[in-house]
Amino acid sequence: MGQLHFFFFPVMAHGHMIPTLDMAKLFASRGVKATIITTPLNEFVFSKAIQRNKHLGIEIEIRLIKFPAVENGLPEECERLDQIPSDEKLPNFFKAVAMMQEPLEQLIEECRPDCLISDMFLPWTTDTAAKFNIPRIVFHGTSFFALCVENSVRLNKPFKNVSSDSETFVVPDLPHEIKLTRTQVSPFERSGEETAMTRMIKTVRESDSKSYGVVFNSFYELETDYVEHYTKVLGRRAWAIGPLSMCNRDIEDKAERGKKSSIDKHECLKWLDSKKPSSVVYVCFGSVANFTASQLHELAMGIEASGQEFIWVVRTELDNEDWLPEGFEERTKEKGLIIRGWAPQVLILDHESVGAFVTHCGWNSTLEGVSGGVPMVTWPVFAEQFFNEKLVTEVLKTGAGVGSIQWKRSASEGVKREAIAKAIKRVMVSEEADGFRNRAKAYKEMARKAIEEGGSSYTGLTTLLEDISTYSSTGH
């Protein structure tokens, strides 16, 4: 059997493309021929890192498919989820993505890969793969835990048994007692109405169940009960091969994942080097979560009231800075560093001065926090983030929440400065802080071992490659 060839096709969003790039690098480092499929305006996300890894003998090819934005009523430059002008245009975006099917089939015809690893949001790729008799493996970009919770919520609809939005219900049939409120479940799930998005989600689930299996950016020791639940109780074929961000050993790779950082990495490291171990709070809400100006104002006041040193990453599209409390930067200039734009997150979380991570609980960020051994202050906003929060606070017990209870795609609001300061202090300086820290450090060590030769994720990838090799030689 010759060299295996994998196609990697992420949906065009930073939170999906970056782990896919890491995954392609990981597969290539194990002797696989890796090809990433993307669109012309997203090539930059991958190209620099691919160039940088050439000297290590890691060869990754990029193949481009034109994105039909204009034909689907989107602005010409709109080739990424974060560039969509409004949520109303989400269906247009996915319609445009579906039009990439024919060019993808031409590429498969030409290159004859052995396997297609594609994003959950590309459900039509299951049929494409079947057409060429190659396995399609789904990449969700989230945790085993979140998918187990989501599955139970969908099947059992426990949110129907409560009389108010604030009353908690237990999610049935899980290894732990997980409690949620109605407003922490996505409106698509709880409304029961059919919309373009609910139809899309249904298609994604059906396509999932027909696919060959699912690959996870996670590791067995982190979610043991839920890996078992997903594979044995729900009966799905799955491989845990993460944390993918840990394949970035090089300082350049850690610093420049996805976009160029808005701060010089040396300046950032110098600032962190001048601080005591575990003394800095890192605040960052990913590339998609939106906050109202009043919520950002409360966050600033909460950070200041916590009395802790901090690095705060603020998205640049907030042109006017009316939300910054008057004199905030002046008062906190010794204590804090504000980064406007994109930060070298993995580099920051790996630094010993960082003692807590205020996060929206997107899975990439959550796992990067775990890999850095950093306790978390959880502030979920939408998607499956409320489920990931429960994994951190109830199962791993490596963090505490600010009390965010409202699933909101547009803009998070309603969390008060007192709650923010209290959660930060609880994780940083309360009598519980050492416990959070020790558990977080233990998971960091487990993560490191998982990706080393003989570790659970290393072995998981070996198994995946063997499975595909067998499939290729037998045709099933």
Curated annotation (Swiss-Prot):
UDP-alpha-D-glucose binds at residues 343, 345, 360, 363-365, 368, 384-385. PROSITE patterns: UDPGT. SUPFAM superfamilies: UDP-Glycosyltransferase/glycogen phosphorylase. One of its GO terms (molecular function) is scopoletin glucosyltransferase activity. It catalyses: scopoletin + UDP-alpha-D-glucose = scopolin + UDP + H(+). It holds the Pfam family UDPGT. Induction: Up-regulated by elicitor, salicylic acid and virus infection. Its EC number is 2.4.1.128. The keyword Transmembrane does not apply. It is an enzyme of class 2 (transferase). The active site is at 16 (proton acceptor), 119 (charge relay). InterPro entries: UDP_glucos_trans (IPR002213), UDP_glycos_trans_CS (IPR035595). An anthocyanidin binds at residues 16, 383. CDD domains: GT1_Gtf-like. Keywords: Glycosyltransferase, Transferase. Glucosyltransferase acting preferentially on aromatic substrates of the phenylpropanoid types. The best substrates are scopoletin and esculetin. Required for full resistance to virus. Belongs to the UDP-glycosyltransferase family. This is Scopoletin glucosyltransferase. The gene is TOGT1.
